[in-house]
Amino acid sequence: MNTPTHTHPHPFGSTATIRCERAAAELRTGRPVLLIDAHTRRHAVMALDSMTAQSFTTFANAVGNTHYLFLTPARSNVLGLEAPQGARIPLATLSYDSLVKLAYLRQPTHPTTWVPGDIMDAAATEITRLALLLPAIVAAPLTHHTEHAFADCQTLDLTDLDTAAAGASTTEYELVTRTPVPLRDLGMSEFIVFRGGIAQRDQVAILIGQPDLSSAVPVRVHSSCLTGDLFGSLKCDCGDQLRHGLATLKALGGGVLLYLDQEGRGNGIAAKIRAYGYQHVGLDTIDADAQLGFGPDERRYTGAVMMLRALGITRIQLLSNNPTKVERLRAAGIIVEQRIPVIGQITEQNEYYLRTKVSRAGHDLDIDALIMTSQRPQDPSETVDGETVKSIPKTGHA
């Protein structure tokens, strides 16, 4: 059995973070991972998102039909289950198609037999998060009769996840490169690329103008949104917030925009587009994510904090409508002296989304007031593909 080694006699020994990354890569490619807890219990786990009907059958046969489906608390709640630790649902009598419906269908048949999840399931779910997969797990406890089938699989001790998580909050991000880039309407900027965290993803800081780093620096912490930032989606206000945020940084004499690789509130682009499908049938953005097993906001701001510290910034004016973001940055040691609203546009397509952010995520926007103060004769700039757009003033108080 491929048991993890925690002492490294040579300079290229594995670390907890590297073992977590390898486990995430294995799940993403549709292979099982073995988890070991403090009592040496072994569980084989696979991510349903990367399974096929064939691999499901192979897994079931290998574990002697002792496998179960683990659903997160968010998805369990959708199914009407009171399961604050998530729910394990036995699969011995369920087909692959039935399993998929139970994990993802909007109105599935509710399971009658289940037990609460435990630390193994929480660990497996965390690995799927690292892999940007949907958090539904097919797993089974192993015995000496069944573990031989998984002899070549990646093994991960649960303590590795704890160690990696603890290290993520203290490990500095490496500054990889920086260079000037001229931007339309903004003049010369500087793009600074950092690398760090689990999966060693590249994150970008954009320095606008010449801010005084000894004072409270204007900062926009912006999570990537492919559909809104790049393609101008009308379903959200992300693209507007990006562009208006950059313009505000310039107007304030300079600042920093942190562009974080956290698509879909940290769930990934595939999950985001899947959630759009649920929104098309009437669910709001938070309930749509819950259908897939996600909480209201899976984003983490450790990377943002590390980047600010690397730039020598500890005091900021935060451009955001989200008080929770202020709280998280303050909890990490960043002094947020002021929150400045970032106002975008309301369209017929994104008004429900914005109201949901206010009513369910605590964002600070008076949407009705903003609509009332923006009524004026329509001009050609206020239409997009024939759709009327309600412009919100780019300045003012939210």
Curated annotation (Swiss-Prot):
Signal peptide as annotated in the record: none
InterPro entries reported for this sequence: GTP_cyclohydro_II (IPR032677), RibA (IPR000926), RibA-like_sf (IPR036144)
GO biological process: riboflavin biosynthetic process
Catalytic residue list: D297, R299
Region (Disordered): 375-398
Keyword GTP-binding: yes
Keyword terms: GTP-binding, Hydrolase, Metal-binding, Nucleotide-binding, Riboflavin biosynthesis, Zinc
UniProt pathway: Cofactor biosynthesis; riboflavin biosynthesis; 5-amino-6-(D-ribitylamino)uracil from GTP: step 1/4
Annotated binding of GTP, by residue: R220, V221, H222, S223, S224, Q241, E263, G264, R265, T285, S320, K325
Record's catalysed reaction(s): GTP + 4 H2O = 2,5-diamino-6-hydroxy-4-(5-phosphoribosylamino)-pyrimidine + formate + 2 phosphate + 3 H(+)
Main function: Catalyzes the conversion of GTP to 2,5-diamino-6-ribosylamino-4(3H)-pyrimidinone 5'-phosphate (DARP), formate and pyrophosphate.
Stated name of the protein: GTP cyclohydrolase-2
Native organism: Xylella fastidiosa (strain 9a5c)
Name of the gene: ribA
